[in-house]
Design a protein with these regions (language model features):
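N-terminal secretory signal peptides that target proteins for export/translocation
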Residues: 1-27
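N-terminal export leaders
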Residues: 28-32
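C-terminal/domain-edge helix-coil "capping" segments
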Residues: 47-79, 169-172, 178-245
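Surface-exposed short loop/turn segments
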Residues: 132-191
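Short acidic, glycine/proline-rich loop/turn micro-motifs
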Residues: 94, 163-164, 208-211
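N-terminal segment of the mature soluble domain
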Residues: 78-152, 191-194, 221, 225-239
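Bacterial N-terminal signal peptides
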Residues: 34-43
């Protein structure tokens, strides 16, 4: 019986006077009903509706990132230094030559906004170039750089074109985010895998964008910005209102 729930009896309250009834504050249900009516009148999306409802009743709660939840590491509070590296297949490089660099820069930009210390990506790029454009594994990076955490985003696919519709634009991508912590074993630093998360990204989810209303380069930039935020939110905690859906 230790784990059984016990229902407490309801307390009896005296009937309210007419004046007290008139002065009662609206209930939460009444607030929510008013919010729904207001949002519908303003043509707000369902997402905005629930964000507003959540903020009304609960404030703007902080969401724990998958990385924090899965590893116990808080990149902000623990003051960890992070190395971020992206990799893309040749099929992506041949069509979107700048996307690897752009995603790296934009993801790091978002980490820095949270005061997360990040290894200079130019130093990482120089190291890789000096090694013939390749790096063997995360431990190789751990030995060369003074990082506490290594984040490797392995992008499997990336496109900005709607399938079978050259006049329409829609961003699609998928890949895997790997996380490693760096530890010293004997006299050598090694990277230990502590986080793996597959991801898929689609933008916009509903209706593709006409190529007549946006240039391909402008659309690609917007999509890279959105993807960078989605990836960054896997790594640091954020408020519910900041969630990219």
């Amino acid at each position: 019986m230790d784990d059984a729930l016990t229902a407490l009896p309801l307390q009896q309250t005296p009937p309210e006077s007419e004046s007290r009834k008139g002065n009662r504050l609206p209930t939460r249900s009444q607030f929510l009903f008013a919010l729904v009516v207001t949002c519908l009148a303003c043509n707000l999306t369902g997402c905005s509706l629930f964000v507003m409802a959540g903020k009304l009743f609960f404030g703007d709660p902080k969401m724990m990132s998958p990385f924090h939840a899965g590893t116990g590491y808080d990149l902000v509070e623990d003051e960890l230094t992070v190395l971020v590296i992206f990799s893309t297949p040749e099929s992506v490089k041949s069509e979107f030559s700048s996307v690897e660099y752009d995603l790296t820069e934009e993801t790091i930009r978002r980490l820095k906004r949270r005061d997360i210390k990040v290894i200079d990506p130019d130093d990482v790029a120089t190291f890789i170039d000096d090694n013939g454009g390749y790096w063997e594994d995360a431990s190789e990076l751990a030995r060369h750089f003074d990082a506490d955490i290594i984040v490797h985003v392995d992008l499997d696919s990336f496109t900005c074109d709607e399938e079978n519709s050259p006049s329409l634009l829609r961003g699609r991508a998928d890949g895997i985010v790997y996380g490693y912590d760096v530890r010293k074993v004997g006299d050598e630093k090694v990277a230990r895998e502590i986080f793996v998360r597959e991801f898929t990204s689609t933008h916009p989810r509903q209706t593709p964008v006409s190529a007549d209303s946006s240039s391909r380069s402008a659309f690609q930039k917007r999509y890279v910005d959105l993807m960078a935020t989605q990836i960054a939110q896997m790594l640091y905690d954020y408020h519910a209102s900041e969630l990219i859906r």
